[in-house]
Amino acid sequence: MTFPLLRLCLVGVMLCLSLPLHANEAPPSLIEQGKYVAQLGDCIACHTAKQGAPMAGGLELSTPMGTIYSSNITPDRDTGIGQYTFEQFDRLMREGVTPAGQNVYPAMPYPSYAKMSEGDMRALFAYLMQGVEAVKKPNMEAQMGFPFNQRWGLALWNFAFLDKQQFAPDAAKDEVLNRGAYLVQGLGHCGSCHTPRGIAFQEKAMSDADRSGQHYLAGETVEHWRALSLRNLWTVEDTVQLLKTGQNRFATVSGNMADVIHHSTQHFTDTDLTAIATYLKSLPPGKDDLPMPAVAHEPAAPPKELFNSRGGLGYMQFCSDCHRSDGGGVKGLFPQLAGNPSVASNDPASLLHITLTGWKTAETATHPRVYTMPGFARLADQEIAEILSFVRSSWNNEGTPISAAQVKKMRDQLNPITTDSSAFETPRLAELLTAPNAEQVVRGMRLHLQTKELLPNNVGNSLNCTSCHLNAGTVADGSPFVGVSAFFPGYAPRAGKVVTLEERINGCFRRSMNGKPLPPQSTDMQAMVAYFDWMKHNTKPEDRVAGRGVGKVDTAIKPNLDNGKLVYAKQCAVCHGDNGQGLTRADGELVYPPLWGEQSFNIGAGMARAYTAAAFVKRNMPIGFHEKFPLGQGGLSDQEAVDVAAYFTQQPRPDFPDKLKDWPKGGKPVDARY
């Protein structure tokens, strides 16, 4: 009996010794709550460097006083917060003071986190300590000039501006409004970007109830982005949709907000999103706020300046393929500019920033595919100013003009880098207005952009010339027109004879357009030829023109039709339709062309040949895929391009009655459809 009693005593002692260890282990439910609190606070966005380990810090944060680097908040005991007690963590979060007694810069939104409840703070601490992987990564020192590198001064800043009180619900407001106020003012720290700052970098108000509450969320410029006023935002449903998906019927997020949506708000519960939106809607508009639209923009007639101003022509060349001539954008893909608050904002910082450096959509569960707008820094300051001034004054936008000096100032601050080393010189459609025959060449350009609309009797399907000759024939490797007229008359193997430029154009009408030829001497044909001649410049018949045609792919690559179908579904269907029918808007206007069916090109078209189509696809499709100027075009591998081209070129399409007359002297390509 002695030994069992001894064993029992030993077990009891071991249990007692182990109790402190288990007492420090948070229950899974608390860690899960803490993970959600971390999402509410968007901790990962600031505490994760680009391509860095989550929560390990190192992200560069620019301030008017210098550069700060976010800290490592993983539970690593040497370089992170692994040795913090809860009390030390709580003090840091509420007062901005580290365990060593050092004040942190208020770029960390501890004045907002001070409003957190103790329950949320304890849950967050449990998650960071037990739900995040420890990473050994030393913190980087801030690069601050005098006197801002004297951290003792931050204690005075705290004395003047810090309110350490936790959020107290307003008894006069319901539970939804109070929850929204708690999230916006506290964990969400929305005011860090959206509230104007004072001379000491303090937020002018920490809530709408402050003495200066009219400033709360009234808009601020942060790191060259304009954080718009959030007061009296759209309807609750519209705001919920934006926070959940990154876009709604009025706007699409950009800049740092895309990361906020991706890492943070898309993960909020619908109840919390509704609470946030309800609170924002309850705030009266600021004195300088533009009125928030209540009705989404409907397609409208293009502005009269579209084709008779430099800004309008620049817009048509570089912007309209995604944002459309009416500024309506493409739903779910590219944002509308008509009625877009960032476009017409009194402070155009975001618009300038996006134009110079580019933009990406937020990656969300609703919109998992990221679309990219390349930067347009290669355009001159005056060109950008003209285009943006046109955008800000069109489609009922009421923004003030942009000057070249404003563009230059932003360019100098951002120092955007262009990496495209192509020798191709992109023609500028704005220069059409300086031509002696300006009216004729502008008409010729429009016939390429609006072929179906302007020549309905000659176009037998839904295509326009620009469907294949991108941006009206001005994109390298997008079948551009630069120098082309210098090579006509020229021998055409398919015709077996020398053809004129007019005959070549009519070949497109009969094949790609599945339509009827234009009379060679007609006004419209001569306008099209004049447009080609305008792009001829000094090209001679013996010259090689950089970027001409669509390039080539190796015809030894064997297509895999099964993979082609998969590539089409993943990369192409969103613009060209699940069944190749193209993409149309609600009013029936074609946005992107059909790739097969009765409204597509016939079997006599060059694009009906698999390897020709593959070369085009490789260099030009999809658009919005990455940062390549000017459409973010191309990006598939050679094999993927061949596979998907073989897949869609073999789909049903109209016949070409004169196909038997092609290649009369032999040499028919192996991928001809007949």
Please describe what each predicted stretch is.
Residues 1-30, 68-71, 92-100, 119-174, ...:
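Post-cleavage N-terminal segment of exported redox proteins
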Residues 24-25, 35, 371:
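Boundary of Sec targeting at the N-terminus
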Residues 28-49, 53-62, 156-159, 168-198, ...:
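Sequence/structural segment immediately N-terminal to covalent heme-attachment motifs in c-type
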Residues 32-33, 40, 48, 53-80, ...:
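Sequence context of c-type cytochrome heme-c attachment sites
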Residues 38, 84, 89, 127, ...:
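Conserved hydrophobic/aromatic "anchor" residues
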Residues 48-49, 54-59, 102-104, 135-142, ...:
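Short, solvent-exposed loop/turn and secondary-structure capping segments
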Residues 61, 67-83, 88, 94-119, ...:
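Axial heme c-ligation environment in periplasmic c-type cytochrome domains
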Residues 62-68, 143-165, 170-171, 181, ...:
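Primarily the internal scaffold of c-type cytochrome electron-transfer domains
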